[in-house]
Regions:
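Long C-terminal interaction/binding lobes of large macromolecular proteins
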Residues: 1-239
Length: 239
């Protein structure tokens, strides 16, 4: 007689980028083992790949392509899956901002951590009186490729490739040019034609992108100085 199956609960959350409600389950022991091995390797690319694999396994809603999700969706999803799997509170050690050396232990409820949106963020960029550009968010795969693949290309080249991959279309009142219809080289050459003011608008798009963020107040036990600390990005919430 085969052993019985263990029932796994399902939970719901709303993806920050699309507002789509999806269903997910906690990760299993075999998936936790995969994550532990990746974390022990201290290899950022391996950790990110493990996170993506676990998320794929845990999402039960059909049609969700993890590879295409923005980085902040991936981070938010994983944080919630982790919370339902091993506990919704995480213990961290934060270095006191006032002296830069004293560790402060804190407990953070994962339910309080949200993706924060900047009011100044805009996916559309005006290049001149007639020409505009619409951006799209970098996927996790693009983020990995441009940050953790070290080849002969310079950092500047990788940055331009990342930006080029995040341009969705260029348009005016009469015509639309989809970047899916042209080569990456052509898009990079288009970027290189921009002046400094135009390029700064692209930088602003990335700087104001939605991000996983949590603000808390800490008190240095030695100096009694109270400080405000902002934690951003998934790595900030690993104990």
């Amino acid at each position: 007689m085969p052993l019985p199956k263990i029932a796994t609960p399902l939970y719901e959350l709303e993806l920050p980028s699309t507002k789509q409600t999806i269903k997910y389950r906690p990760f299993l022991v075999k998936e936790e083992k995969l994550l532990v091995l990746a974390l022990e390797s201290e290899d950022t690319k391996q950790i990110t790949t493990a996170i993506k694999t676990v998320i794929k396994n845990c999402i039960s809603t059909r049609g969700v392509k993890v590879e295409d999700l923005p980085t902040f969706d991936i981070e938010y999803l994983f944080l919630n899956i982790r919370g339902k799997s091993v506990g919704e509170e995480v213990e961290l050690s934060i270095i006191a901002p006032d002296d830069g050396v004293t560790p402060i232990p804190v407990n953070i409820d994962l339910d309080e951590i949200k993706v924060v949106e900047n009011k100044e963020h805009n996916k559309q960029i005006r290049l001149d009186d007639s020409l505009m550009m619409e951006m799209k968010y970098p996927s996790l795969d693009q983020f990995i490729k441009n940050n953790f693949d070290f080849d002969d290309n310079s950092n500047v080249d990788r940055s331009f490739e990342l930006i080029a991959s995040c341009i969705d279309k260029i348009f005016n009142e009469e015509e639309v040019w989809s970047t899916a219809d042209v080569s990456k080289k052509e898009v990079v050459e288009f970027l290189e034609q921009m002046n400094s003011a135009q390029f700064k608008q692209i930088e602003k798009f990335f700087e104001t992108m939605p991000k996983l963020s949590h603000t808390l107040e800490v008190v240095n036990p030695k100096t009694k100085v109270k400080s405000t600390v902002v934690l951003e990005g998934l790595s900030s919430f690993f104990g």
